[in-house]
């Protein structure tokens, strides 16, 4: 056998999980079992299979074309891209230019910092969470940043209450969407944020049950950053801490592992937490914490190539807050 052909067969078979579109019916039955899926009717099952088949074709194509990342059948594979975005993200777009937070312009070239940096290695990032079908990514990303700020300042990890933001933030729209910097504004207006244990996550809009006596974090000031260079995020990340950023999530839905090189940039719809950066096989990348549980991606994280505005990571101003 030709050595090149043999290499390609081994490479594709290893990296793409050797999915075969002709085996879609068999994969679908395995999917139903593995993810405990049940449908209300035969017509609904057929509808979901057609979506699954379309997603499988996309997964196969991505595994062939984006050779530094791997994509797989996962819990979202019977949902259309629009369904996944509408149910499992939640970033809104501002109707006007809102600058409650102080705007800082960073127009100098990036410093010569370390090639790799990861706040997780310093134990300053809380565990991966799962927002479920509540569109509150904005709350998770913002509070993820505050959790890290608290850990940096007090050397202690604490989980904050996304549910408090969902119920009591009247600037944003709870499970129907919100913004990153306005979430900081809401925490400042409320006077603080409670721990998750005191105000547990329910994944739906509820009545505000604020208890100021149980605030564990209070926000002094918030900032938004204008970056002339995407690489400047490295300096900001090291100096400030993990940063909530906005992305287009449509191309990460079926992600499994690796560095994403090709990622849609058609409109921001999701918020995630930037926690680090590194280099793999000569390709620099960002490390991002998602809110789709540890059974997605790299134990809940994903990586995208730097300096190509992957997933639109540079389209919206990153933000941070200073805590008391």
Swiss-Prot record:
Disulfide bonds join 134-175, 168-208, 263-311. The keyword Hydrolase applies. The active site is at 137, 270, 290. Synthesized as an inactive proenzyme and activated by proteolytic removal of the inhibitory propeptide. Glycans are attached at residue 159. It is an enzyme of class 3 (hydrolase). It catalyses: Endopeptidase of broad specificity, hydrolyzing substrates of both cathepsin L and cathepsin B. Its EC number is 3.4.22.50. Residues 1-18 form the signal peptide. InterPro entries: Papain-like_cys_pep_sf, Pept_asp_AS, Pept_cys_AS, Pept_his_AS, Peptidase_C1A, Peptidase_C1A_C, Peptidase_C1A_papain-like, Prot_inhib_I29. GO terms for biological process: proteolysis. PROSITE patterns: THIOL_PROTEASE_ASN, THIOL_PROTEASE_CYS, THIOL_PROTEASE_HIS. Residues 19-113 form a propeptide. One of its GO terms (molecular function) is cysteine-type peptidase activity. Keywords: Disulfide bond, Glycoprotein, Hydrolase, Protease, Signal, Thiol protease, Zymogen. It holds the Pfam family Inhibitor_I29. Transmembrane segments: none annotated. Belongs to the peptidase C1 family. Cysteine protease that plays an essential role in host liquefaction to facilitate horizontal transmission of the virus. May participate in the degradation of foreign protein expressed by the baculovirus system. PANTHER family: CYSTEINE PROTEASE FAMILY C1-RELATED. This is Viral cathepsin. It comes from Choristoneura fumiferana defective polyhedrosis virus.
